[in-house]
Amino acid sequence: MTYRAKSDFLNVMIERGYLADCTDMQALDDALIDGPVTAYIGYDATAASLHVGHLLNIMMLRWFQKTGNRPITLMGGGTTKVGDPSFRSEERPLLTPDKIDENIAGMKQVFARYLDYGDQGAMMLNNAEWLDSLNYLDFLRDIGRHFSVNRMLSFESVKSRLDREQSLSFLEFNYMILQAYDFLELYRRYGCRLQMGGSDQWGNIVNGIDLTRRVLDAEIWGLTSPLLTTSDGRKMGKSAGGAVWLNGAMLSPYEFWQFWRNTTDADVGRFLKLYTELPVEECDRLGALSGSEINAAKIILANEVTTLLHGADAAASAEATAREVFEQGGAGGDLEVVTLSADALASGLTVVQLLAQTGITASGKEAKRLIAEGGLRLNNEAVSDPQLAVDAALIGDGLKVSVGKKKHRMVQLG
């Protein structure tokens, strides 16, 4: 990104790597200089908690508030009843109103850790406020006439689904109209002039901008973040044990800490910029470390991210537990080392095959039973998928395999 921003917020977005695209960088920059801007990100309530994949955009809202602006977290109490079809191969299962409300309550706990809510602070809204009471015929006449079906079919999120000859229901097709209407209502009710989101939401964001300009002649903007993957191509938000939840009741602070401690060397500097508030220069310095020194940077990363979500005490406790496990009979010299050849990985190796071939379990059948009963952990993360692929990235400098509470092995590449 070569644009030289004048506003603090856009400077942070560019310098730390949050920015993928913006509908009008110069106009947004000028507005941010002139005074506080209100912006929102929408979250459909499809699960009981947010996960690490949502954290990038949550940090964007946090920086937005820290640079003197007003963020809105928009809960999709209305749109969740329809379901976002973007880049999905099949229709989302429909949730009951009670389940949607339950999920929203769980998500609110996460946002409260990152944003300051109040009369002059961040706002938490629910689009059911205006969507639930819509009159369908009035909506078609007043709003639907502004949308071109030809243009909607050209958006990549829809086009990719149709190109694969996968069904797209009329219910789902309406989602992008409802999301666009959210922006119009947020501008009309709260003066919101910026929508942010992942780059997969670009089409939905542009729809909202076009609608609001047509109906209210408003100058508003959209800004997207990159869809983040790890250096080895894995999608953020997942670990060997499944989703990395931002709810302590669904994933313990210790397991959350371990997720960040196990970051691949090549990702440390980038993740420090995106998920912590350390100065950029310090992030670059830590990310440039190598060998055993990079492990200290990973601990700093884990502590900083865990502190933001769960608090400093939880981060300190997680680090202390990790030291006890790894240094006093965990992943240090006291563990029996199992060496795995690179050839063993070449043809593909599942975690079941790893356990059986290295003798950690007596057979593949025993390994499957162990996983089904929740008795296997890799680097202290529970594993539930017997088909989990074991590769060089997962093994890294050493993969701690725990069977039950007392049997531990260290798998290394020979």
UniProtKB/Swiss-Prot annotation:
Gene Ontology molecular-function annotations: ATP binding; RNA binding; tyrosine-tRNA ligase activity
Chain positions recorded as L-tyrosine binding sites: Y40, Y175, Q179
GO biological process per UniProt: tyrosyl-tRNA aminoacylation
Catalytic reaction annotation: tRNA(Tyr) + L-tyrosine + ATP = L-tyrosyl-tRNA(Tyr) + AMP + diphosphate + H(+)
GO CC entries: cytosol
Main location: cytoplasm
Positions contributing to ATP binding: K238
Subcellular location: Cytoplasm
Domain of life assignment: Bacteria
Known EC number: 6.1.1.1
InterPro entries: aa-tRNA-synth_Ic, Rossmann-like_a/b/a_fold, S4_RNA-bd_sf, Tyr-tRNA-ligase, Tyr-tRNA-ligase_bac-type, Tyr-tRNA-ligase_bac_1
Membership in a protein family: Belongs to the class-I aminoacyl-tRNA synthetase family. TyrS type 1 subfamily.
Subunit-structure text: Homodimer.
Protein name, per record: Tyrosine--tRNA ligase
Gene from which this protein is expressed: tyrS
